Structure formats: C-alpha cells, structure tokens
C-alpha cells in the first residue's frame, strides 16, 4: 500500500467518525420539511468538508468526499440500520459496510448526554435567526455553546443522543467522533442551508456493484489493513 493511499484511508476513518456524529445529530432535529437537503460544513485534518444530508420521513443519507473517496451514510428513521458506502474509484474500491443492531447501539452509547440552559444571546447564522443554548455533558461537566433556530422544523427521522432537547434545530454545534484511543474527538459543524431539494434517485439504496462487508472490515480498511 502506498503512503498516499494509507493517508487517504486514515482521512476516511476520521471522516466516517465525524459524519456518523453529524448524522445522529441532524436526524434528531424536529423538522417541518417532509423531505429535503441539509448542507453542512466542517473540517478535519486541516481540510474543509461539505456534507449533503438528504432526508425523508423514513430515511437519511449523508454524502461527502474525503480525498479520493466518496462516502455515503445510510440510515432509517429510527436509526435501527446503518450502512457506510465507500467508493474510491482510483483504487477500484466499492464497499458497503453494514452495521449490526448491537454495533449501532455501541456507537450511540459512546456519545455524551446533555442538559441544557437557554440564554438570551441571539445572532444570525446562514440566514437563520439563532439563540445560544449552553449544553453541559452530564458525565464530564464540560459545556458547549449550541446555536439553535426555531425558523424551521424538520422530521424526527432518528432518536438522537445529541441535541434533541436543545429547544430548536441546531445550526452551529459540536459533533463527536471516537478516536483511535477510544476518547471522543470534537469537531465544529455549521449548517449553511436547508432546502426542499429531493435526493437523487438511488440515494438511499446500496448499489448492486458494491461488496458488502462488516463494521470490522471497515475498521481494518481505516487502519490501512486493506
């Protein structure tokens, strides 16, 4: 395996963790749209990443690029299924990692549980009227400033371990991924737009030319083992 391929796979690993965090969060928000697209920005390893989150009443798909890899995360409305699609055309890699229900529960259980304290601070972010809510991690007592809006509502397409009780749709917030040492790594997310644009055809399905693998197989890829 070349050095560049190893670096790209490691970047993919970081991207998957952050994207899963974002999917869990955004799917939890109470939305007034029945279907549409959420665009969000974040950064990882010094690279700016734009994510497209397509949603319906019963499905969510998050799509983004990490180096040469195109990633798509698929989940159902209740977050009872989770699939990671990895397409790296340069290396002829097309994989679909299917998580088991127990594996999904393990991932979700690692995330913080928050209590919330609304503030009187307000500002506009991406055209949304937002108010600041201070979220406190019940375990570590660390606090996070979460900016939420009541300008829009979105369908509850998953049960969130994040900001379901924040009092609005999070627009600027902290997301979490599990690092290689087992500790949570934080990333900042900003939603830049919410539209009624429908997902492209086939967005929520596993393509027929993708090889199905396990979560363990995916983690081996992320460590550069494949």
PLM segments and residue spans:
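Extended soluble regions of mature proteins
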Residues: 30-226
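Bacterial Sec-dependent N-terminal signal peptides
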Residues: 1-33
